[in-house]
Amino acid sequence: MKIEKLSPAFKDYLWGGTKLRDVYGKKCDYEKVAESWELSTHPAGQSVIDGGEYDGLKFGEYLEKVGAKALGVNGAKFKEFPVLPSDEYALRVEGEYGKTEMWYVVDCEPGASLYFGVNRALTKEEFKKRIEDNTLTDVLYKADVKKGDVFFIQSGTIHAIGAGILICEIQQNSNTTYRV
């Protein structure tokens, strides 16, 4: 699959300024640019494919056209539960930044779910036993998902992508991940 370049959707709200254009090089005809929606399928401002076979196609239409080939992480079966370190911890222990992620649900099967964060206090012993018994999801928050949902996964949060979900993962520039 070829990498596609996207042009953002710009917003010229009253409180906008010139920094996005002057400092970050955003090419926009607006005098003041309030927001630059870099990866957007929102009807009020979609990103657009810039060049190539799909030139001019809105990002949402592109995703509909190419589907799962476009991008993503595909959840299948729970084999591990990632925990992403905070910047403070990762810098101290790993020598690089931690990782916070945002997930956009590209597609999912009916009844698909994501899991993140513990829903009650756990002892170290119970946590270990739940891993051994494959019952860890029983003590994690569960979120039923639908196509188009967006989730912010703060560093330090245990999480898992359930079966039948294809996500686009936008993450902090780090590959430091601990797995349970």
Language-model features, listed with the residues they occupy:
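Conserved metal-binding segment of the jelly-roll/cupin
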Residues: 83-84, 144-163, 172
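A generic local secondary-structure boundary/capping motif
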Residues: 92-95, 103, 140-142, 156-158
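Gly/lys/ser-thr-rich phosphate-binding loops in alpha/beta enzymes
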Residues: 75-77, 140-149
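Double-stranded beta-helix
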Residues: 116-139, 167-180
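Transition-metal
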Residues: 1-122
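Short helix/loop capping segments that flank catalytic or ligand/cofactor-binding pockets
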Residues: 90-92, 113-115, 154, 161-162, ...
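Short solvent-exposed loop/turn micro-motifs enriched in small/polar/acidic residues
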Residues: 98, 135-138, 144, 152-154
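Extracellular structured ligand-interaction cores
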Residues: 99-102, 158, 164-167
